[in-house]
Amino acid sequence: MRSEMTLTSTNSAEALAAQDFANTVLSAAAPGFHADCETPAMATPATPTVAQFVIQGSTICLVC
């Protein structure tokens, strides 16, 4: 049951829209760490930004 719910939720229009938004915003990201917070990077500094975009506006159960 849970695997069916996971497959359905990952293919939902909302999930795909969130992924597209995050990919569009961070399309200029470069590998490595940058000291400038305005420069997107595919390292730890970029991770909270992606999480913020994906989590904002949706409900996620961390207990399940």
From Swiss-Prot:
Modification after translation: Maturation involves the enzymatic conversion of Cys-61 into 2,3-didehydroalanine followed by formation of a thioether bond with Cys-64. The C-terminal meso-lanthionine then undergoes decarboxylation. Dimethylated at the N-terminus. Dimethylation is required for antibiotic activity.
(E)-2,3-didehydrobutyrine: residues carrying this PTM: 44, 47, 49, 59
**Residues with PTM L-allo-isoleucine:** 55, 60
Which keywords does this Swiss-Prot/TrEMBL entry list?
A: Antibiotic, Antimicrobial, D-amino acid, Methylation, Secreted, Thioether bond
Residues modified as N,N-dimethylalanine: 43
Specify the propeptide location in this chain: 1-42
Keyword Ribonucleoprotein set for record: no
Query: Where does the protein end up?
Result: Secreted
User: Crosslink site(s) for S-(2-aminovinyl)-D-cysteine (Cys-Cys)?
Assistant: 61-64
List the record's Gene Ontology CC terms alphabetically: extraorganismal space
Question: What are its GO biological-process terms?
Answer: defense response to Gram-positive bacterium
Q: Which family does it belong to?
A: Belongs to the linaridin family.
What functional role does this protein have? Antibiotic peptide structurally related to lantibiotics. Active against M.luteus (MIC=0.2 ug/ml). Has cytotoxic activity against mouse P388 leukemia cells (IC(50)=1.3 ug/ml).
What is the protein named? Cypemycin
Q: Which gene encodes it?
A: cypA
